[in-house]
């Protein structure tokens, strides 16, 4: 049965120089999501040469967060059931991707040179989101 959720996210970044100068930026957002049938979260090992499913095909689209937990290797994120589909992100070590995708393809990931652990969170959205 579909559920309704409120998603609240915030991000703060600070850059500091060796001379003592610093700059900060922050932002936040709240999104009410109705009719959610699918939520996926956790960590998954993404090997080279094979595709790991982050989220099965949703009805309309999804909110997606993926972080490359590896210290040395790159992670590729695809919109589709395999890496033969559209590439939507290339994450260097410790980088993350946060986006909304309006599409019904499965989200997959693959390590490029070594097996990579990905941390992920995906929520299906409806047409009103």
Language model feature labels by segment:
Residues 16-33, 45-59, 82-83, 113-114:
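Surface-exposed ligand/attachment interfaces on beta-rich extracellular proteins
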Residues 2, 32-43:
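Interface-prone segments of viral and bacterial extracellular assemblies
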Residues 58-61, 67-86:
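Short, surface-exposed beta-strand/strand-loop-strand elements in extracellular ectodomains
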Residues 2-17, 112-129:
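C-terminal interaction-tip segments
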Residues 56-62, 100-105:
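Short, solvent-exposed loop/turn segments enriched in Ser/Thr/Gly
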Residues 81-99:
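An anionic, turn-rich surface loop/hairpin at beta-sheet edges
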Residues 100-116:
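Noncatalytic modules at the cell exterior or secretory-pathway interfaces
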